[in-house]
Amino acid sequence: TPLYSSAASDVYKRQAMDQFDVIVVGGGSGGSAVAGRLVQDGKSVCLLEAGGRNNSMLVKTPGMMPFLRGAVNYRYETVPQKGLNGRTGYQPRGKGLGGSSAINAMIYIRGNSWDYDNWEQLGCTGWAYDDVLPYFKRAEHNVRGGGDYHGGDGPLWVSDQHWPNQTSRDFVEAAASLQIPVNRDFNGERQAGVGLYQVTQR
């Protein structure tokens, strides 16, 4: 239920705290996975999401992301970027159940391992890629099965694209002919290269 005022917010908070062990804010991939794990642990959970159910066909059709408006997309802009000659950067962020995963064409690519390792070098203890990888694996149910970089029994289904576009295949083939390394797993040991990414679909 959306919270429309601070007074209403206080009422909902008091009621929720009386009825639930835990309140999770945000119904995106992270919040939904956290809520699911807590329920498995026997907790009663209230999952709060500012947006709606995301039943629109625009949300359910991966190629429609450019047409998503404010009801399902916060449509953030960055501050002017020096490296972009003062331009701002568009940052789509999902509003509704599924969060940004509902409007990202179901693409499943983790952050680059170098970034995580760099965060730890900057003082963020516990954020090295080797530290966070077990959590990625625990969340993932990859149809390729579990292994060094993938989980096989988590709540988030990850699979190869069922119907990859022929243009995408042609692009990969053209890049390979130019000696650009083909990468069949962007969430594996090596993240650079060209290839078809996996998606969050069954």
What function would you assign to each model-found segment?
Residues 14-138:
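N-terminal glycine-rich phosphate/pyrophosphate-binding loop and immediately adjacent elements
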Residues 1-15:
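Single conserved hydrophobic/aromatic residue that forms the stacking wall/gate
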Residues 121-202:
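Conserved redox-cofactor binding core of oxidoreductases
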Residues 11, 32, 165:
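Loop/helix-junction capping segments adjacent to catalytic residues or to phosphate/diphosphate-binding pockets
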